[in-house]
Regions:
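Short, hydrophobic/aromatic-rich segments at coil-to-beta transitions
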Residues: 52-62
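N-terminal signal peptide c-region/cleavage motif recognized by signal peptidases
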Residues: 12-16
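C-terminal partner/receptor-binding element of secreted or periplasmic proteins
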Residues: 93-124
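Cleavable N-terminal signal peptides
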Residues: 6-7, 17
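Positively charged n-region of N-terminal signal peptides that target proteins for export
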Residues: 1-4
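Short, cysteine-centered beta-strand-loop-beta hairpins and adjacent loop/turn segments enriched
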Residues: 37-38, 62-75
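A short, surface-exposed beta-strand/turn
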Residues: 70-94
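Short, non-transmembrane alpha-helical segments in secretory-pathway proteins
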Residues: 20-44
Length: 124
């Protein structure tokens, strides 16, 4: 029975790893860099969910270089219309503040539009 459980784990573990989407993660990192107006962002833990509707990415980050992944507590989340390119950004959140096209706050709505335009330029 133990061998069967171990075999099942080994077979299913690679599928869990493959569920991550490096392409979505890279796209979200582009949004982070554009949002903070920087070319370098240190990224800690990353989780991507291409199988969800909408597909998304959640990561810890630091705008300061030299920070270890365990010391990164700031979070950034991205949601996209699709898991394949062009992803088309549908929403992003910095900590507890979210930005989207349906946002009531005019500044957040404007900031979202800017990020979507910048991302669309890169993905064309």
């Amino acid at each position: 029975m133990r061998k069967l459980l171990a075999a099942a784990f080994l077979i299913s573990f690679p599928h869990a790893v493959l569920a991550q989407s490096p392409e979505l993660e890279a796209t979200c990192q582009t949004v982070v860099k554009n949002f903070f107006l920087t070319d370098k962002v240190a990224v800690g833990s990353v989780q991507s969910f291409p199988e969800l509707k909408p597909p998304g990415v959640r990561m810890t980050y630091s705008t300061r270089q030299g920070v270890g992944p365990s010391d990164m507590t700031d979070t950034f989340e991205c949601e996209f219309d699709r898991a394949d390119k062009p992803h088309h950004l549908s929403r992003f959140c910095v900590a507890n503040t979210c930005y989207s096209a349906s946002e009531d706050d005019a500044d957040r709505k404007r900031r979202f539009a800017e990020m979507r335009i910048l991302l669309d330029r890169v993905e064309k």
